[in-house]
Amino acid sequence: MAEGKKYEIAVKVHTTYLPEQSDEALDRYVFAYTIVLSNTGTVTAQLISRHWVIADGSGGVQEVRGLGVVGEQPLLKPGDTYEYTSGTAISTPVGSMKGSYQMVAEDGLRFDAPIPEFILSVPRILH
């Protein structure tokens, strides 16, 4: 068996613009994102920390690192999923996020689960 399949976490993302928390006059655009993590590998793994790279449409980039997600460090057995919702604010109507989750497998191996880049966009801005 290939090692890549043994340690594998799939990441799916859904975003929502939050107009009620945004203020365009102050260049504040707030988005919620829902993440679904699925352990598609063959070993149990725990999410230890996260690393986000958040970019706005004017070239501004911020990096966020921290332990766990929404105050938790979920343990995912093979076949398990974990879902959470969080949010971010950027200074332009369009931006993007990407990053990785740092995982530790039950055998002690540490590995990264990549978070593919996704777009943050106010509705009707991008076609």
From Swiss-Prot:
PROSITE patterns named among the record's database cross-references: APAG
InterPro entries assigned: ApaG_domain, ApaG_sf, Uncharacterised_ApaG
Domain of life: Bacteria
Domain ApaG intervals: 3-127
Pfam families: DUF525
One example of a Gene Ontology biological process annotation: error-free translesion synthesis
Entries under NCBIfam families matching the protein: PRK05461.1
PANTHER family documented for this protein: F-BOX ONLY PROTEIN 3, POLYMERASE DELTA-INTERACTING PROTEIN 2
Protein name in the entry: Protein ApaG
Naturally occurring in which organism (per UniProt): Nitrosospira multiformis (strain ATCC 25196 / NCIMB 11849 / C 71)
Classification lineage: Bacteria, Pseudomonadati, Pseudomonadota, Betaproteobacteria, Nitrosomonadales
